[in-house]
Every structure is written in C-alpha cells, then in structure tokens.
Amino acid sequence: MPRHWNEHYSDPANLDFTPVPLLVEVAERMPPGRALDLACGYGRNALYLASLGWQVTAVDSSPVGIGILRERSASLAVDARIADLERGEFPIAAGSFDLVCDFFYLQRDLFAPIREGVKPGGVFAGAIHLVDGAPGARPRNPAFLMHPGELRNEFAGWKILYYSEGAEAGRSRRAARIIARRA
C-alpha cells in the first residue's frame, strides 16, 4: 500500500493542506495538548494542529508523505513517524493523548488501542467511508468500509459530541463522522 500512496503524494496536484473541517471544529473547542494523527498522509491535519500549539505525533506508512510533513513541520512540534499500522509497528500507549484523529483509514483492530490511547476527558475525531457509497466510489474493498452505525458502536460508553452519516457536499462517497469524548 505505501507504493500507491508514495506515487500519489509525489504529485503536488494531489496535495491539499487544508485540514479536515471536522478536526477544525474539534481543535477550536479544546486547549492544545498531545495529539495523535493516524494514517496522516502528508500531514495536513498534523500541521494544522501543530500550528495551534499541539504536540503532534503523526504516523503513516508512506515515506514520501512523512517526508513532506517533516519538511513543512521543521519549526513545529510534530513527531512524524514512518510506521505500518497494519503490522503493529506503532503501539499506542494507554492514556497518552488528549486527541486522537483518524480520517479515512480503517483498521478495525486499532479501535481498542485508540480508545485506550485517549486520556480520560480526551477526544477521538474521525471519519470512515461507508459501504453504501455511490457506485464506482473509492475505496471499494469492504475491509476499508464501515456499515452504518458501526463507527458509533466503536465508541459505546463515550459521550458522543457529534455523529453523522452521509456524503459531504461535492463528494460521492458516504462516510460516518464522529467526535467522541472519553469518560
């Protein structure tokens, strides 16, 4: 998988450094602390959080993406790491982060470590593609798609601050989006 993303990130036309709107909403309501950006790509969300004073750990399997992030974050508090999450190369330490974000990367066995990695009172913010997207939309592999309600169920017992399912304006792929606070 890194090969595909390395090629994708090598084309400047594919790089948009605008943070995900859901993350902006979260960051505006929290004081800076420690954040984890999973499957960060070239780091648009990590850069945004760091610009607000967050200490960010950003993880991705793409050396090209992490290289771009490292270049752009030289003066910011970003620890950019190359790690294959599917192989367990980045263990998430319990109670380490005030904020964990995961946008459009699904690895179901990461949810338990993610929940443990968020400090009590901390927040998870994320969005995952749904199986009922438009025909031809990507990703197509069912392993990378959630069923309606599945993301909400992963955070049962947490305070759900925001939850929605549907397509964003201008997008064909439907997604589940969540902001949840650990009790």
Task: Give the ranges of each region predicted by the language model.
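Conserved class I S-adenosyl-L-methionine
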Residues: 1-30, 33-41
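Conserved SAM-binding motif I beta-strand of class I
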Residues: 55-60
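A short, conserved alpha-helix within the catalytic core of class I
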Residues: 106-117
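Conserved beta-strand signature within the Rossmann-like core of class I S-adenosyl-L-methionine
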Residues: 122-129
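A short acidic, Gly/Pro-enriched loop at the edge of an enzyme's catalytic core
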Residues: 90-99
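Conserved SAM/SAH-binding beta-strand->alpha-helix loop
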Residues: 62-64
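Conserved SAM-binding strand-loop segment of SAM-dependent methyltransferases
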Residues: 75-87
